């Protein structure tokens, strides 16, 4: 019973962390272009430095 | 890499033929403030990282472009550009050309068409919140089921209640609102049993928790909500979006025109104030404001609004002209014969407003199912309650069992059965280059037995295309393009597109309507136009199919043009035949031309010289004879019939109005998109029915268990999750069959036009 006192808040806050991380990812457009992101990682930018720019 | 390396010469022509007018691009762009605008273009041929780098590089090289980003998932490029650079107004067509030069097709998509809306964002948030709540409550519930002792169980129940309460209010509000709306209007829908089950189970569980009870349903109510919200979100993605076809059409009618009074004075008047009998001046490049008759002047008129044909007609004194047609080359003086409200464009708008054929009457499969489902569920729960009251007389237990019945029968799998299949099918169609406007369109497409096709722009490409570019030296082509820049004639546009970016030639320029362009330079007089005009002798062919470039009446080059049939037309018509679908042609063009094309494609059922109204009538007649017709068309003259048809499809090269009016838009050139879309929709329809069968089968097994009172929260959780998963996996089979079926129809679509060099 005693362990529950800290284990439950830990479990809940970990879940909450996941939720917040998901909402952040959604908001910052991480899911906008799933196909393109996997290709962009190979793009060295050729000195333009603009490829990482988001709209 | 190889998929992107395409032959630039071919693709430029393709990119060019689709390019919308600069004016349309301006109107479709979004004002970001601070002199910046944003344009969304679709690039259906972008497939890999090299495509991203090429397109973005091409755009960033332009000084007007502030930012450019390709989205490979939606195959779109979003360009933020400056309205002015160095005092010069930006021409957004340059972006299209820049992309086309690198070998990619582009189509304009106006913002509202696919923009993520607020409701979708809220739904996704609600899914996230309910998902969070469901996992945490499930964690606690598993501990309870594993045999937590009384005090711990109560604690876990209380924590669950604290999580579930806010989650139900936040994430469940969509269902509560919709259920309340239905009840208030004396109806019932799928959301009523959902709202009832969720709130009743929460209430009962809270009551049990207070009374230190053994069973609480917090996990069931939140998991239920989680699954249903996923279904609702997917369903929302498949909902039809507001159509702006009619407002797009209204844009084609000019706001006003210059009226010449009998005393010779001129006045610019709003189009509504123009009366029959007024004399009007329509300059080159303007649209005809009202129906009228030509008093003086000669010009080429783009009448694609009226008959869908791209080749301009020459009009001269005495000819009648329709409102909305575009005056291409010379100024005209007209006498108005009708007021704006009686004019041609107004008639089409009226037809489109009236034409809400199969679309409006169609009830979606899910709605039809819900109509029988929810009363049955309510009745079942009520009977269970009454039954247990009669047997035991214990209100609490009877209530618990009734709630269990409501939860078990809650349309979890049913709510997922349709949207999951439709989202997967839409994804499959998108990969094949077909965009779906809404889910009901797919259901309707699966039902059709007749396909009616427009000719120009649908069965054919619809624009003249330079076919002998390889015979002409690049220098001559560049000269011709430099001259052609001065004209809006489709032939001139085709030359410009073949040559790429051309700087206008310097000199004294004159465009002779119905003949060509003449430029007096230091080298001599260049002429580009009909053979008669350029070298002073009539050629073997008509003016439409060739253009001559001459210097001082000496022929320098002969450009030949053709309106080619759309690739894979014949195969597609045969494929439709194999699917058991009848085909027909609806065309506004002359009978001999239509007959020739029909016989070459093996279509016996064709109609020629149809007005937009007659097209609608043919379609209505087919509907009355009991046929469900798919109409494929592209022009403004097709817009009413696209709307009136049971379901409709348009190529991405179609006029804005046509694209908006259609349910499906196909982005690649081959016509095989049509049988591909039909096959996919039919397959999706099959899977939907299978899913319904699975969901009903689940209920047949689970409901007796619930009615007999054996459905503990553990049983409910397992049953609900497994039935939902089965339905989802069944839907995903559609995706697998894509890989298997690629050889059949969509194969030709995937890399259409991307000629490997």
Curated annotation (Swiss-Prot), chain A:
Main location: membrane
Coiled-coil stretches: none
Any one of the GO BP annotations: nitrogen fixation
Name recorded for this polypeptide: Nitrogen fixation protein FixS
Transcription regulation listed as a keyword: no
Pfam families assigned: FixS
Keyword ATP-binding on entry: no
Species in which this protein is naturally found: Rhizobium meliloti (strain 1021) (Ensifer meliloti)
InterPro entries on file: Cyt_oxidase_maturation_cbb3
Keywords, alphabetical: Cell membrane, Membrane, Nitrogen fixation, Plasmid, Transmembrane, Transmembrane helix
Gene it is expressed from: fixS
Localization: Cell membrane
Functional description taken from the UniProt entry: The four proteins FixG, FixH, FixI, and FixS may participate in a membrane-bound complex coupling the FixI cation pump with a redox process catalyzed by FixG.
Superkingdom classification of source: Bacteria
Membrane-spanning ranges: 4-24
An annotated GO cellular component: plasma membrane
């Amino acid at each position: 019973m005693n362990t529950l006192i800290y284990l439950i808040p830990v479990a809940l806050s970990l879940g909450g962390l996941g939720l917040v991380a998901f909402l952040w990812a959604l908001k910052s457009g991480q899911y906008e272009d799933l196909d393109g992101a996997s290709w962009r990682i190979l793009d060295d930018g050729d000195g333009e430095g603009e490829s990482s720019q988001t709209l | 890499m190889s998929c992107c390396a395409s032959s630039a010469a071919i693709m430029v022509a393709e990119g060019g033929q689709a390019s919308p007018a600069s004016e349309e691009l301006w109107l479709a762009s979004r004002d970001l403030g601070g002199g910046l605008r944003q344009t969304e273009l679709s690039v259906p041929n972008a497939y890999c990282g090299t495509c991203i780098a090429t397109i973005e590089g091409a755009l960033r090289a332009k000084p007007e472009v502030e930012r450019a980003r390709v989205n490979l998932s939606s195959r779109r490029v979003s360009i933020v550009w400056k309205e002015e650079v160095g005092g010069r107004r930006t021409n957004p067509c340059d972006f299209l050309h820049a992309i086309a030069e690198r070998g990619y097709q582009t189509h304009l998509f106006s913002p509202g068409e696919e923009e993520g809306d607020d409701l979708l964002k809220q739904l996704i948030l609600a899914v996230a919140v309910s998902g969070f709540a469901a996992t945490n409550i499930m964690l606690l519930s598993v501990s309870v089921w594993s045999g937590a002792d009384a005090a711990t169980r109560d604690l876990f129940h209380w924590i669950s209640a604290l999580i579930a309460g806010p989650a139900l209010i936040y994430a469940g509000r969509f269902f509560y609102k919709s259920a309340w709306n239905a009840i208030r209007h004396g109806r019932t829908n799928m959301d009523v049993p959902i709202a009832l089950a969720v709130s009743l189970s929460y209430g009962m569980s809270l009551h049990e928790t207070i009374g230190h009870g053994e069973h609480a349903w917090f996990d069931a109510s939140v998991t239920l909500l989680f699954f249903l919200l996923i279904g609702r979100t997917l369903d929302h993605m498949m909902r039809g979006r507001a159509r702006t076809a009619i407002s797009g059409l209204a844009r084609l009618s000019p706001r006003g025109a210059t009226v010449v009074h009998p005393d010779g004075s001129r006045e610019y008047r709003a189009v509504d104030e123009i009366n029959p009998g007024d004399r009007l001046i329509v300059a080159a490049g303007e649209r005809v404001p009202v129906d009228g008759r030509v008093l003086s002047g000669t010009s080429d008129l783009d009448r694609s609004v009226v008959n869908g044909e791209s080749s301009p007609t020459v009009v001269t004194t005495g000819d009648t002209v329709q409102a909305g047609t575009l005056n291409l080359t010379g100024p005209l003086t007209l006498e108005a014969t009708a007021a704006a409200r009686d004019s041609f464009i107004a008639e089409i708008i009226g037809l489109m407003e009236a034409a809400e054929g199969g679309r409006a009457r169609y009830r979606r499969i899910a709605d039809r199912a819900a109509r029988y489902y929810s009363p049955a569920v309510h009745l079942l729960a009520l009977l269970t309650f009454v039954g247990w009251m009669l047997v035991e007389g214990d209100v609490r237990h009877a209530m618990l069992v009734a709630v269990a019945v409501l939860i078990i029968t809650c349309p979890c799998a049913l709510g997922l059965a349709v949207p999951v299949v439709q989202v997967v099918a839409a994804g499959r169609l998108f990969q094949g280059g077909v965009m779906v406007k809404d889910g009901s369109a797919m259901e309707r497409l699966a039902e059709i037995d007749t396909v009616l096709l427009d000719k120009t722009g649908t069965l054919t490409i619809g624009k003249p295309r330079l076919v002998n570019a390889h015979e002409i030296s690049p220098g001559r082509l560049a000269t011709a393009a430099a001259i052609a820049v001065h004209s809006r004639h489709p032939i001139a546009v085709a030359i410009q597109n073949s040559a790429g970016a051309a700087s206008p030639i310097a000199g004294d320029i004159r465009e002779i309507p119905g003949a060509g362009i003449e430029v007096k330079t230091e080298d001599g007089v260049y002429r580009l136009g009909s053979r008669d005009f350029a070298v002073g002798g009539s050629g073997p062919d008509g003016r439409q199919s060739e253009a001559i470039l001459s210097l001082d009446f000496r022929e320098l080059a002969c450009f030949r043009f053709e309106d080619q049939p759309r690739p894979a037309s014949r195969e597609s018509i045969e494929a439709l035949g194999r699917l058991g679908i009848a085909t027909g042609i609806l065309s506004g063009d002359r009978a001999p031309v239509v007959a020739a094309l029909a016989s070459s494609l093996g279509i016996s059922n064709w109609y020629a010289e149809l007005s937009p109204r007659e097209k609608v009538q043919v379609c209505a007649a087919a509907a009355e004879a009991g046929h469900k017709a798919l109409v494929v068309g592209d022009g403004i003259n097709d817009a009413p019939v696209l709307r009136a048809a049971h379901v409709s499809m348009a190529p991405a090269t179609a006029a804005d109005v046509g694209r908006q009016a259609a349910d499906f838009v196909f982005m690649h050139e081959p016509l095989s998109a049509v049988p591909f879309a039909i096959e996919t929709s039919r397959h999706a329809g099959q899977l939907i029915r299978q899913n319904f069968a699975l969901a009903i089968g689940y209920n047949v097994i689970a409901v007796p268990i619930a009615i007999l009172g054996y459905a503990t929260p553990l049983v409910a959780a397992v049953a609900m999750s497994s039935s939902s998963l089965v339905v989802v996996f069944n839907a995903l089979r559609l995706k697998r069959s894509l890989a298997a079926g690629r050889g059949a129809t969509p194969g030709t679509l995937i890399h259409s036009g991307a000629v490997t060099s």
